[in-house]
């Protein structure tokens, strides 16, 4: 194979990757705009939780922050003093930086794999936060990886701090295949503006990349790694999404 052909193949691959990311991003924005995953309700609960628990200035680390648009809204009129966001996407972090300005707090943005960086930050005694937060991301990991992340998060928290997890969660007696079919059934029934092509993208993504745990499994992990308490603060009407708090 000539070097020219190799270069052309790499360029074609990069173009296809960017095109695929663009399609996924557009679909995600449609999901957010139409509130198909209930972001408005759950981030309202997040806002109320932060107002209730933090009447003094607090710091937050968000893992996989994306453009932080919903987090920014949840932080309005709270005592947030410093926000740190980690994401693999440079364009998303640039938007997150712009979005976070409205909160008037110090903003720090780190490019990289949030799970790997969580491990590295946990080894630094100077890196401690009042709140660590992640939304619709942890379920992409296998159970052993989830446990490692939650253990590292526990080490990142100041005494009295807590880890807030927004994510999809399986019902207690539901296996993964049943969860996938139930979730996709809800998508087909309720996500009325999704095209057949977009539904196929959702099907491919969920079937290949979603590995949600049950609430009891997450509670067991929280106890195993040393959290003192665990609470389900919110559960959506479809029983697919929860907001969980792990208290240090």
Indicate where each model-derived feature is located.
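C-terminal alpha-helical "lid/dimerization" subdomain adjacent to the S-adenosyl-L-methionine
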Residues: 166-223
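Conserved S-adenosyl-L-methionine
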Residues: 64
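N-terminal, positively charged/glycine-rich alpha-helical extensions of SAM-dependent methyltransferases
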Residues: 1-27
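A short glycine-rich, Lys/Arg-flanked "PGG" loop and its adjoining helix->strand segment in the class I
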Residues: 147-159
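A conserved beta-strand element that flanks and buttresses the S-adenosyl-L-methionine
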Residues: 133
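Class I SAM-dependent methyltransferase SAM/SAH-binding core
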Residues: 61, 69-71, 75-117
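Core SAM-dependent methyltransferase catalytic element
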Residues: 226-248
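Conserved alpha-helix/loop element of class I SAM-dependent methyltransferases that forms part
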Residues: 38-56
